[in-house]
């Protein structure tokens, strides 16, 4: 088997994998190769588009709950990191593939406590070195951010280093809210606090938010990434390109079709 290195840029009609084998063995692996290569190339491509739109900001893969089954969620997380994501919320993918596991708490964490401040305070005690607080459970500007600022202030007063901290928003007008949130955090003395966002993001929405001047610097992308929602199938094919003759030379083979896009490129290909 010959293949391009994972993460390589590949163009249409360019071969990704070459299999040299007896015909029966080559046929036996066809379905497995197509299943693996098509799905993970699809997700890696979508991830690359999202990361490009983020213009250097960190992108986290958040899609397991919306993936088409546990395998696609786990292997999709792997592909997303190959495509440029800095980590995944999928802890199984982290265990299997030794990739960074990232994320925040859920709204249910907040709702399980008597009040939002208590929930934030407890989370900060558990994760002082990665304290990202989800601020939109009740009201982002009137409740979430003021309570987050109180927690960050208490941490600073207690001498706890604020190495990686900030907030996440999962709803609302993200451009408007992020600007307000940035001003509130800066005014409170936390200019290096991270502003993270999620909520059905994709490359188009991230680009739009950038153009609107959003102050978001970290993106959690789930459904639209792990399903490649706008283009959910990758059209890779596995075709016979050459047959080895008795004298050791390769005889080119071509698949013809009335549909020009289904005509294959014949001949033994060289992989670099």
Regions inferred by a protein language model and the residue ranges of each:
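Gly/Ser/Thr/Ala-enriched C-terminal appendages of enzymes
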Residues: 183-188, 193, 201-272
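Buried, small/hydrophobic-residue-enriched core segments of structured protein domains
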Residues: 2, 6-191, 201-211, 225, ...
